């Protein structure tokens, strides 16, 4: 509806007439569209229902229902005196509220962030779609604040939490820290739930205060698997596939596929490099020298061969959006017969792939590339630890020594090219939680970003860059990964934060990749480096997916997308 309404607004504003009824009839608008077009044509309008009916000359059926629908969806606002207006004209904005564990929240309204004190949340929960009135006065730090006026749509029907006895009744403490504590359980619902058990409760929004009633017992709060189950239920993660989807996947996985139309790379030595606990293998790499150029091959599993547009599998994958990795399980986006089967590049098994072939000169500059359908047979599954042994020269296999000599040399050259281009490297410390055999966390392990990790990162970035360039040059409608330049206000705050760390700042703009790199290089051996990285990250815009290619600030690239995972 929105693109149509935008076009309608432009047309109405270009017409030199006040006869809204004739305009609406000429444009053949629905009742809701006609009402909204009336206000969009004259944004300052404050009309009663009778005045709206008069303006539209009674030409539209069910006007009352249309107006109420617009109010419920947040496109119109019912103000004092039962007058209707566009919300933004009254300083009211709609969007998804985010609530911190402290109870305070915020809402993004365009480029502006409206801070909301816990006293002004008005019963909204984290993730709800709300309408927020922005206050005219600003708080300290020149931040704008506001109050939730109404909840347009609830983000959840229930929650997981620990059941507690409270006097003669029961309460539930949600596992999600952004939700309010001590939510009352309806008295009749606590009889089959005991103290300290984890339960899933359905929420009751009908009263003035939030209440719940227990729907299912999940397990003991002393059970790690029950705690994971509570997270699955709390986020409404679909942990099972329908029989129809499973049957479709199994049928496709067992069907033979043809090599016709694919370039055969099965004789090219190919490896995968993944974490030691990886459950599936999405990408593989090969390299060879052709006419004095290094020819890098990045192979990606050809999932589209099995998952066609608008099929049952495609619909299910869209609903799930991603695979979810939990301590004791994976909830895959596709059934395991695909995700962990024919779409996983297992060693010594033929697999259909899409291959990005990139040629690099002796300096590491890309001179040519192509994208082709292919077939590969991975020769070896390697972990990062194994790959690192060959990167630092301690590996024992002669064939792999030669292979990593070429791979490592190209990766080093790509590092130099990226440095010269002005890429911003914000690599910070990464830690992984380790679990004991009983399922409880046993400690943290520092993940070292060594040359093996860097090699895969470099090669995947180059493949993504090549595919993005191809899509841009071919004018294809795709989602790019864009990262806009920082705004001036965040640069001022960053300068203050870096100064507080004792960093000597150069004159001029600091939101320049070369300047930021020099600052971080100066903190290379300092314990303050991770904090500086955190400050810089907070000052930058978030990288997002967009059909509009505006470039990638952090990578200093004119086009970038996620072709690889």
Name every feature range the model reports, one short phrase each.
Residues 1-5:
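Hydrophobic alpha-helical signal peptides and transmembrane signal-/tail-anchor segments
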Residues 54, 195, 206, 224, ...:
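Electropositive polyanion-binding surfaces
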Residues 6-300, 304-349, 381-382, 389:
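Charge-lined substrate channels and their catalytic hotspots, especially those that engage the 3′ end
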């Amino acid at each position: 509806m929105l693109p149509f309404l935008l076009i309608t607004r432009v047309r109405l504003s270009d017409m030199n007439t006040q006869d809204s009824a004739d305009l609406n009839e000429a444009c053949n608008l629905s009742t809701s569209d006609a009402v909204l077009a009336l206000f969009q044509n004259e944004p300052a309008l404050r009309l009663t229902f009778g005045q709206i009916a008069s303006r539209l000359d009674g030409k539209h059926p069910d006007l009352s229902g249309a107006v109420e629908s617009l109010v419920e969806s947040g496109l119109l606002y019912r103000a004092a005196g039962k007058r209707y207006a566009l919300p933004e004209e009254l300083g009211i904005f709609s969007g998804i509220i985010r609530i911190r564990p402290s109870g305070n929240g915020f809402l993004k309204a365009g480029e502006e962030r409206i801070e909301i004190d816990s006293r002004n949340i008005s019963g909204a929960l984290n993730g709800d779609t709300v309408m927020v009135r922005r206050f005219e006065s600003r708080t300290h730090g020149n931040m704008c604040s506001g109050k939730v006026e109404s909840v347009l749509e609830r983000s959840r029907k229930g929650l997981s939490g620990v059941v507690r006895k409270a006097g003669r009744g029961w309460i539930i403490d949600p596992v999600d820290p952004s939700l309010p504590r001590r939510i009352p359980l309806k008295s009749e619902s606590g009889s089959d739930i005991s103290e300290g058990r984890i339960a899933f409760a359905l929420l009751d929004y009908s009263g003035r205060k939030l209440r719940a009633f227990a729907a299912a017992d999940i397990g003991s709060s002393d059970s790690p698997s029950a705690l994971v189950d509570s997270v699955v239920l709390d986020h409404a993660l679909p942990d099972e596939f329908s029989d129809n989807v499973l049957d479709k996947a199994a049928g496709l996985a067992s069907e033979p596929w043809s090599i016709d139309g694919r370039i055969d790379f099965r004789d090219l030595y190919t490896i995968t490099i993944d974490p030691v606990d990886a459950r599936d293998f999405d990408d593989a790499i090969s390299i060879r020298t052709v006419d004095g150029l290094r020819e890098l091959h990045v192979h990606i599993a050809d999932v589209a061969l099995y998952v066609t547009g608008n099929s049952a599998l495609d619909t299910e994958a869209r609903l799930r959006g991603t695979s979810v990795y939990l301590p004791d399980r994976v909830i895959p986006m596709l059934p395991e017969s695909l995700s962990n089967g024919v779409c996983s590049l297992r060693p010594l098994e033929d697999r259909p792939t899409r291959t990005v072939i990139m040629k690099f000169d002796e300096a590491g500059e890309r001179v040519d590339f192509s994208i082709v359908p292919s077939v590969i047979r991975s020769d070896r599954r390697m972990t990062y630890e194994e790959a690192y042994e060959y990167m630092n020269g301690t590996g024992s296999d002669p064939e792999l020594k030669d292979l990593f000599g070429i791979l490592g040399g190209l990766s080093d050259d790509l590092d130099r090219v990226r440095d010269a281009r002005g890429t911003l490297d914000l690599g910070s410390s990464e830690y992984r939680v380790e679990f004991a055999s009983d399922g409880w966390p046993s400690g943290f392990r520092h993940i070292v970003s060594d040359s093996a990790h860097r090699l895969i990162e470099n090669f995947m970035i180059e493949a993504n860059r090549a595919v993005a360039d191809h899509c841009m040059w071919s004018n294809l409608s795709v989602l790019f990964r864009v990262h806009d330049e920082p705004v001036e206000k965040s640069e001022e705050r960053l300068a203050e934060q870096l100064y507080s760390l004792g960093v000597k700042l150069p004159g001029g703009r600091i939101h320049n990749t070369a300047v930021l790199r020099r600052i971080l290089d100066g903190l290379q051996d300092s314990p303050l480096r991770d904090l500086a990285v955190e400050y810089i990250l907070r000052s930058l815009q978030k990288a997002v997916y967009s059909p509009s290619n505006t470039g990638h600030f952090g990578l200093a690239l004119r086009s970038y997308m996620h072709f690889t995972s």
